[in-house]
Amino acid sequence: MEVSMSLNALTRLPLKNTGRFEEVGLARHSLFSSRTACRETAVQQRRMVFVVEAKGKKGMAARQYQRTPPPMPKIEDDGNPRFVIFIRMANVYLWYPLSIIAGGTTAKIMVAAKDNLLGKYIYKDTIARNIAAVIYRDEKEIQKTAIKQHRVLRTATEFRYGYKLVENGNMRAALSTSDVIELPTQDQLKTVFDKVKDYFGDAKESFGKLSSLNPGSDEKTEETSDEKAKA
């Protein structure tokens, strides 16, 4: 009985300094506990936001990766070889597919002989020079077309050109930027162009006109030229 009375007395005694009851200590403890719980809740919310953002970025990357590639340009199989023309900035070794050029009878003979010893020399050297001659003849128009297709080339002031043979009608392999054969520059072409022309004929007879890889762009070019002629 005495013990219980002494305990009751202790719980009701005021503090010496403040005059408050000991329940203040319980209130402080409750306030500290609520602050800790709020901090933990805020941390958990931040973690949830981070997880949601990470999942969102991953989903966007997956959608970009699953984007369907552009359709392959259709080419007629008339027995003549086709070559994909590439362009790059002179100071950056990164090729961009530009157009397709069809070869004539002379080009067909060169391609047929490319697997023997003499044909390798003719194929790598003479075909390259003939294609380069066709390109440099209309280089300004070719550069305009290239800048429209690849905006990254707008800042370039000097270009290099290359080509790949379309083998077995495989356009996808021909459009890849690996194993592109670089064409000689205009200065290099002038040194031996006359000899090549005398032996193999004019480059214009060996190769047809350049065709754009984007369908409909040739029609737009022709319409523009007609409008300029009428004006």
UniProtKB/Swiss-Prot annotation:
- Indicate where this protein resides in the cell: Plastid, Chloroplast thylakoid membrane
Q: Which domain of life is it from?
A: Eukaryota
Q: Which residues cross the membrane?
A: 93-113
Q: What's in the keyword line of the UniProt record?
A: Chloroplast, Membrane, Plastid, Thylakoid, Transit peptide, Transmembrane, Transmembrane helix
Q: Name one GO cellular component term.
A: chloroplast thylakoid
Here the segments flagged for biased composition (Basic and acidic residues) are 217-231
Where are the residues of the annotated region Disordered? 206-231
UniProt key word Iron-sulfur = no
Where is this protein primarily located? plastid
Task: Give one Pfam family, short name only.
Answer: HHL1-like
Give the membrane topology.
Single-pass membrane protein
Q: Name one GO molecular function term.
A: mRNA binding
- Which residues does the annotated transit peptide occupy? 1-39
Q: What induces it?
A: Not regulated at the transcription level by high light.
* Gene deletion effect: No visible phenotype, when grown under normal light conditions. Partial loss of PSII capacity after high-light stress.
Protein purpose: Involved in photoprotection. Forms a complex with LQY1 that is involved in the repair and reassembly cycle of the PSII-LHCII supercomplex under high-light conditions. May function in guiding the release of psbC from PSII core monomers.
Q: How does it assemble?
A: Interacts with psbB, psbC and LQY1, but not with psbA or psbD.
**Record-given protein name:** Protein HHL1, chloroplastic
The species is Arabidopsis thaliana
Taxonomy of origin reads:
Eukaryota, Viridiplantae, Streptophyta, Embryophyta, Tracheophyta
